[in-house]
């Protein structure tokens, strides 16, 4: 569509293709928008601050089909606008006249129709100008391309023209050359018509020149074709070679990459190999140094071996010489033995003559029985009958006398070997110190085998006599095959064994002697510090009466009554065969230490009891068990007012307290401190432990406040020092009967035992947790300390098992069965136990002969009945607490593991069970209490009925 304006006025123009005929070029917008057949028109309007930028097409926003929008494009895009140059020029001139119409727009801006018309005209003009510009651009492009093509053709034509000119010049030169050569070859002749001749020669020359040029041109073309073919062939070959070369390069790169990977791995392996080589080099160096050292050691060992071989040869020579000397000494020894036994027989005969006939002392080879025992009488009678019946030859009698002492010594050594001293007995808590002390006391020269020394040995009389009779029978059979004068069977090593035993015995004796000297010095020093040396004690420290001050000895050895006498040094050979006899003083002390209470009230000359004081008490006066003793404060406090067990300060008094010293009787008190092992020998609670305090045979329980101590489980092997700290070593077993206690209680004879600690020693024992007293318990002062009481109670502590709980490996089943049988017997025969226990002892009869005529049952009427609110009896006031409670026996249904046992002395609770092991603990003297372990319950200390007594007789 084209609008042609002339001088600003619209004119009718020729109809253009794509437009309707007869339509004005300038039409109204209404005319355009009224057509309903027009499609949706694409429209875009970019309103920016810059100059308006128009696009001919927009693919995003479509206008609406009504008159508010201009439907563009007015001309179809497919319409071909073919304008002439004149039309285009006139149209552009029309566009240049738009500046003149600006004023018209400003004047008519209020007329919306005029503005709309102007916009429509402007739109159409803009569209037309755009179409014109498109057509001009297309023509310009085609013309530019054609111009470039023509320029290229002109260049080629120019090159061809220059080439042709060059070839033409060359050809011209060649023609001139050929023409000159032809003119020279032709003879000179005068032509009639020279002008014709010249024309003909020039034509021939031109023909020849053209022919040669054509030939050369053909040759050059053929050569050019050949060269092109060769060039194409070379090109193809070059391409193939390049491909091969590229493939080769790729292969080389791949191989190079693989080689790099291999080099890296090989370098890593090389580094590892280098490290291994360095380490191996170090190891080689170290091994070489070790080889050098070992070679040096081997050389030194070789030299030493040679020296040892030489020493061995010398030792063998010396042994041969010593063997020869030993044989000579054996002969001399046999002669000495004969002389010795002859002297012994003479001495024995002289002693038998000098001794009075009334003496009931019968000397046994080992002194196993007391002098006035029935077993000693039977044995002596049997020996006399055997001696009368057997009329042996003098040689046999002499031989028996010679070897009797040696046999006895060997038997003692065998007895000691039954309980090995370095280690504990299996199934016992005893330390090796007791066994070594026992063996040394039995086998040393001046340890007498008469009296109570053997009576207190760990082997009891019955078992020991059975063993020794069996061994004596065996040895008697063996003696028939021996020759006179030989200390054993020929070829035996009796002498070497005896010498070895003597050396070990001497070492053991020296160590024990040093230990006992130190203990004695330390104890004497303690007594001197406490002022005990001024008490006028005339009792020898080695006697049985000094065990009150030497309680540590009895605690250590596990049995009291052993006489620690100083022993002299005798030759080793004489120690083998010398009769083990002591002095008259030793025999006297042995008689005093006999475990019987026959002369309990008899005064003995030269024997002063420590703290001796007569009691100014009327024997006819009757005392109740709940009365107060002399050392009480005098404040009568009833039992319901029991307080806590914390001790309070006790004011010092100048009164003498007889309850804190030994009882005032001229009797011999034997305290057999046996090691009683219960089936519950692990971590148990022992109630009470007397803490190695000397306990009188007769005494009230006024101050016997037992201390609950948590007993640790002692391992099997204890050293010498550990045995002193063992709590169960100090457990005391009283060997007196309960009937004597009642009789002495009724006669007013009483004593007390020092208890250093209060009830709370073990942090409130488990046995007293059910009752809390309300009154402070005043602890009594020890007999060796000044009259002072501590101001405060010591801190409570409890023994704990620091060592691993070893299995005690006891013969617990036999012990348990024995205790079970004893408990069953207690249940069956509880009514007749008191009569049996009293009738089994001659002690009661002896006491009755001294005027104590009251019956045991008479004292029971004074025992008050304890109610449950009074609390445990042991927490009562410090007066004479009742020892028996009329409530029957302690319940029998108590567990076997309870370690507390009620003793026969004043209601003391002791671990008086039964232990069965190799040591055979003996109950010496009077009867030993055999009862099951029971636990102290609230308000019950002991049963009213006596437990069954088992007498050794």
From Swiss-Prot:
It holds the Pfam family HAP1_N. Residues 47-354 form the HAP1 N-terminal domain. Residues 786-796 have a biased composition (Low complexity). Residues 658-672 are annotated as: Interaction with OGT. Residues 104-356, 492-532 form a coiled coil. One of its GO terms (cellular component) is early endosome. High expression in spinal cord and moderate expression in all other tissues and specific brain regions examined. Expressed in all cell lines examined. It comes from the Eukaryota. O-glycosylated. Glycosylated by OGT; glycosylation in response to increased extracellular glucose levels is required for and leads to regulation of mitochondrial motility by OGT. GO terms for molecular function: GABA receptor binding; myosin binding; TPR domain binding. Changing residue 329 to P: In DEE68; uncertain significance. Residues 472-495, 777-796 are annotated as: Disordered. InterPro entries: HAP1_N, Intracell_Traff-Reg, TRAK1/2_C. GO terms for biological process: axonal transport of mitochondrion; dendrite morphogenesis; endosome to lysosome transport; mitochondrion distribution; neurogenesis; positive regulation of axonogenesis; protein O-linked glycosylation; protein targeting. Residues 359-509 are annotated as: Interaction with HGS. Involved in the regulation of endosome-to-lysosome trafficking, including endocytic trafficking of EGF-EGFR complexes and GABA-A receptors. Involved in mitochondrial motility. When O-glycosylated, abolishes mitochondrial motility. Crucial for recruiting OGT to the mitochondrial surface of neuronal processes. TRAK1 and RHOT form an essential protein complex that links KIF5 to mitochondria for light chain-independent, anterograde transport of mitochondria. It is linked to Developmental and epileptic encephalopathy 68: A form of epileptic encephalopathy, a heterogeneous group of severe early-onset epilepsies characterized by refractory seizures, neurodevelopmental impairment, and poor prognosis. Development is normal prior to seizure onset, after which cognitive and motor delays become apparent. DEE68 is an autosomal recessive form characterized by onset of twitching and/or myoclonic jerks in infancy. The disorder progresses to refractory generalized tonic-clonic seizures, often resulting in status epilepticus, loss of developmental milestones, and early death. The C-terminal region is required for the early endosomal and mitochondrial localization. This is Trafficking kinesin-binding protein 1. The lineage of its organism: Eukaryota, Metazoa, Chordata, Craniata, Vertebrata.
